[in-house]
Amino acid sequence: MRSSVLSLHPDRLLPADPGTRAIARRLYAQVATLPIISPHGHTDPAWFATNAPFANATELLLVPDHYVFRMLYSQGIDLDALGIPRADGTRAAVDPRAAWRVFAEHYTLLRGTPSALWLNHVFHDVFDLRIRLDAGTADHYYDHITAALQTPAFLPRALFERFNIEVIATTESPLDRLQHHAAIAASGWQGRVVTAYRPDPVVDPEHEQFAGALQQFGALTGEDVLSWDGYLRAHRQRRAFFAAHGATSTDHGHPSAATADLSPVQAQRLFDTVVRGEATPEQAELFRAQVLTEMAAMSLDDGLVMQLHPGCFRNHNRQLFEQYGRDKGADIPMRTDYVHALKPLLDRHGNDPRLRLIVFTLDETSYSRELAPLAGHYPSLLLGPAWWFHDAPEGMWRFREQTLASAGFYNTVGFNDDTRAFLSIPARHDVARRVDSAFLAKLVAEHRLEEDEATEVAIDLAYRLPKQAYNL
């Protein structure tokens, strides 16, 4: 069967109604080429430090992208057949071309998903491909992309510049020595790559690496991390180290949004239980909750913006986790409480405008009921954009619809791409800019906004708000 033409319609994601679409076109034209602010994500800083060529199409576009391979896994495709690394660092002996062929044969599984939007954008605009990916074009795609990746124009730094990225934030453990960020800073290259402090391995007693990570934390900082005061000093030390390497934010991926405000005596007693490895699930939750409030206090001192990404049941598939480890597409959204969960932290610090806490959710039912009213009241609280399972066009639209009334636009922070898939970053930002243009065009068409106001909001959402929210 002959492969079909790959094209990107200039009006994709814009309204079907001709009048509203015309407004959206004008709004989108004002934001389409703005620089990209990428304030939160998971790209590898080694890419930009070494500027080495990406290996091949499979290693770049398939292996790191759990959005993609989770869909294939759901249809019975073994992750070994895709070359996904196992938990012990080994891989099945699968040829990258063969893995790509499997992906191409099943590319139809992504129809209508945001992954298809992003990948088609990458294929069309980054690699200049004009036929669709399928079983018949798999080798053509693999050869074309892999050959391009060996050329100077496709080195990581060249792509960073081509994508018009003004700044990108990576996310590192407190145990990371940040040697790649140091190398970038020393290289003379003008691309701005900053880090973010993600202390989960030394904050979550239920993390499989917690005991060993805590030991390393102490060795790295020289602090007595088996005492509560020493543990907090170690965090302050590492936060300062991260800030010296460009960090403007911290990130916390907790099962819930729980916070606590224990006395020092209560905190020490709880910490003693944790370090002995005797914490119950309830005590582990209380410990994470207390550390969040401590992190907020530290942010008042050092100015780092807090991000909270709660409400995900991590590694739901035990067998897959044991075989392949974390971040393999088996994380599932959960119902999440914010009103009660955040109250201890907000009682302590919520009225201080020096604190900036950006809250995300995978529970869309909380948008209008809890999060928008909270952000529309507390000067310390901002709403992160539609996240992960909800960064599809439909999810972005629902986010705007359900938060606008109580939080407005200016208690939100623009867009985060939050991705490991480097080449998809322009596509993800383009989708967000198109959806916001469409949403704003509807408000203009309904005479709720003047077009000049909508234009200013569109620019703010695409560029100014993320810079402002993250101190970039």
Curated annotation (Swiss-Prot):
SUPFAM superfamilies: Metallo-dependent hydrolases (SSF51556)
Lineage: superkingdom: Bacteria
GO molecular function: glucuronate isomerase activity
Reactions listed under catalytic activity: D-glucuronate = D-fructuronate; aldehydo-D-galacturonate = keto-D-tagaturonate
Biochemical pathway: Carbohydrate metabolism; pentose and glucuronate interconversion
Keywords: Isomerase
Enzyme class: isomerase
Keyword Isomerase: yes
Enzyme Commission (EC) number: 5.3.1.12
GO biological process, one term: D-galacturonate catabolic process
Similarity comment: family membership: Belongs to the metallo-dependent hydrolases superfamily. Uronate isomerase family.
Protein name as it appears in the record: Uronate isomerase
Organism: Xanthomonas euvesicatoria pv. vesicatoria (strain 85-10) (Xanthomonas campestris pv. vesicatoria)
Name of the gene this protein is made from: uxaC
